[in-house]
């Protein structure tokens, strides 16, 4: 009997792949194995649980049993794969062994925690289980330190402030969202957060955390000390590559795959936050959706290359929502920025005056799809 397709992981990437496989083939055996509960939840909602006063359990959308029944697959929750044998085409968890015809690693990425003294006091919110583990502390905390002014850090800072907490956001760069956009565009969000009451400490790094009876003492690189009830690390994600390394797959920042999502080993693929697609890490929902559609076809016999158009990235900060697309990180773009009371439009042009990126906020977000169409016409 054909052992079929074996997927390691149960997050958004894995589920998108299962759904795409079943749209094309109702018979191929699918087995999904993951270390977590395998229940479905919407990960972006983790950035808004505090203002909505939600618990971790309230985020669950579908149990693993219902998912398995709906899409006709075998699911193994709370099962950690400890080894892969690509020669024998099998995976192992302790004494248990499963064979595969095609193997997909959709094992995600882990939140990075700066290795400063007291780093074990830092919390992360990269999964439903991580929120479940820390929700009592975070829901009760009044003074919160957020380390990292990127996408998730800004979303959490605004949400916690809306929930009535005293929030301090620390980032080593000189502006928010520095990995996504120029300072001229992000200053509007910076002003909005400060107006809400978020204390922004930019060009600063965390030096140490110390637990005391009255709370956690955070010491910054400039010597300043803060007293907080909780500290959250939001400085980025590191792809989970340990299992792939053990299996002899080529890894760089993530598990290296080509444009067909194939790893360096035959019949082994990677998808989602763990995958490095031709040198790029793309930990956003839309690239994963496109990749899952392509990979499903390839697992069923095709040899298609994933095509990733310019896609919208949404910054879910309700008091000042933003959308961006294109090569916003390019250093050689010339930006034109129009800031009005009803919103901002920022356009990045290359040396040939071709539109290569844009950022829109508030009421001007209605222009996003037209600008996106213009971007994709150039590719």
Curated annotation (Swiss-Prot):
Enzyme class: oxidoreductase
Keywords noted in UniProt: Cytoplasm, FAD, Flavoprotein, NAD, Oxidoreductase
Cofactor(s) needed: FAD
InterPro entries membership: FAD-bd_OxRdtase, FAD/NAD-bd_sf, FAD/NAD-binding_dom, NO_rdtase_NorW, Rbx-bd
GO cellular component, one term: cytoplasm
Protein's cellular compartments: Cytoplasm
Catalytic activity reported: 2 reduced [nitric oxide reductase rubredoxin domain] + NAD(+) + H(+) = 2 oxidized [nitric oxide reductase rubredoxin domain] + NADH
The protein's annotated pathway: Nitrogen metabolism; nitric oxide reduction
Highest taxon in the source lineage: Bacteria
Protein family according to the UniProt entry: Belongs to the FAD-dependent oxidoreductase family.
Protein role: One of at least two accessory proteins for anaerobic nitric oxide (NO) reductase. Reduces the rubredoxin moiety of NO reductase.
This protein's name: Nitric oxide reductase FlRd-NAD(+) reductase
Species assigned in the record: Serratia proteamaculans (strain 568)
Gene that encodes the chain: norW
